[in-house]
Amino acid sequence: MEIGKKYELNPHRIKSFIDISSSNANMVGIIQENGGWFEVKSILSLDGFDYVTEIICANGEIYNDDGMGDDYFELSEEEFYCFREYKEPTSEEDKVEDKVSDVTKIHCIVDENNVDEIIELLRKTFKA
């Protein structure tokens, strides 16, 4: 990971990430509840390993390793494989979306832990 770059969880690695540490489930929640991606603001190098110690989420919320409980956020270099670089939607996608009426775009990450929650969100969105 690099300072200034944006990342999101790799949907195929969420379970692996949560299995690494009990606090990682909270970090998955932080990412998903704050826009689905984050930008790295600070990295600490210690004993030959890099640690992401501060992020800013898609919605502007900031989390770091000074946070307590549910606000704690820190990624070790060994966890970086659970993430991928976030790609901004292209202007082509935006143009297509503007031409199609009644389109709702939802960005979400689904795994076996939140599938029911996501299904309910989709139902509420499309069955008004």
Swiss-Prot record:
Protein's organism: Enterobacteria phage LZ3 (Bacteriophage LZ3)
InterPro entries documented for this protein: FRD2 (IPR004885)
Highest rank taxon of the organism: Viruses
Entry protein name: Uncharacterized 14.8 kDa protein in frd-Gp32 intergenic region
Pfam family, one: FRD2
